[in-house]
Amino acid sequence: LALMYLLGCPEAELLGVTATYGNNKIDVVWETMNRMLSELGQTELPARKGGAARGEFQSDAAEFLVDMANQYAGELSILATGSLTNLGGAYTLDPHFFEKVKEIVLMGGITEPLVFEKKIMDELNFSCDPEATAAVLTKGKNVSIITGNNCLKVLFTKEEYKKRLLGTENPAAIYIREKTDYWFGYNEEDYGIGGFY
């Protein structure tokens, strides 16, 4: 959804997207991401595949990040919503990488037990590659973190979903409806909530 938002945000100049593992294996994420870009008519957007596992720092994604940091030194903002292996790889390729990046926004980490409808959830993004995470947190500048705990403060209800996405023929809205409608049934059945975080 973050990528969908950026694709539709006129204020953002999206330079590219890199795939990483975490919620699934890199090959599945890569295929899903490319299918989404194709279905949305965004195949001209540069997309690069990242490392497949912890510490796999040599990747097209890491090289792309270094190239973008060099080309847009002091201007580049990075949003990382998965494991941080690609950023760790960029730092391995260029020890001055983080000095060239304007800001980094991360989704990951927990600050207290993450309880989701009486179920304790494990942290995912930072724990996938602790070494890469340590590099980003200690070497990066202007790093903001949106933790799992922060995410639980905002529930996207079925009513809000209908209000924003039904009754429009906007291609992005149609795509989101087609790809996310099942989340409501899943969350209601598994967690007893009428929405998702």
Description of each model-found segment:
Residues 1-197:
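N-terminal acidic, glycine/proline-rich low-complexity segments
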